[in-house]
């Protein structure tokens, strides 16, 4: 998946605002960032999930990994865009979007 496609999927969610900051695109809902594209470098993104949401989604794709350190243990998740499939991208972004709004981000659906 390209960074532009990832941003397009995120932009399809309700009330999403995109803002470029220092070369990365920050995606927010209700003033809370739920994903950043182009960080930690080009071809990557980072999403904020709960630890349970992170675990559930990481079981579905090798494109996700916890950020090293404390932030990763709290659900901050690195996304390798080039290996991320469309269906999983939608689930990842929906989960991060819901988490930013204080809703459950845990999926029980199988990979697909």
What positions do the PLM features span?
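Charge-dense, helix-prone N-terminal extensions
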Residues: 1-112
């Amino acid at each position: 998946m390209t960074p532009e496609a990832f941003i397009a999927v995120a932009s399809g969610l309700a009330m999403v605002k995109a803002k470029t900051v220092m070369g990365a695109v920050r995606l927010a809902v209700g003033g809370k960032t739920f994903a950043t594209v182009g960080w930690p470098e080009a071809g990557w993104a980072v999403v904020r999930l709960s630890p349970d949401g992170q675990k559930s989604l990481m079981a579905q794709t090798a494109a996700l990994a916890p950020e090293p350190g404390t932030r990763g243990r709290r659900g901050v998740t690195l996304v390798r865009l080039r290996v991320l499939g469309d269906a999983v991208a939608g689930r990842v972004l929906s989960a991060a979007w819901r988490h930013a709004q204080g809703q459950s981000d845990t999926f029980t659906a199988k990979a697909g």
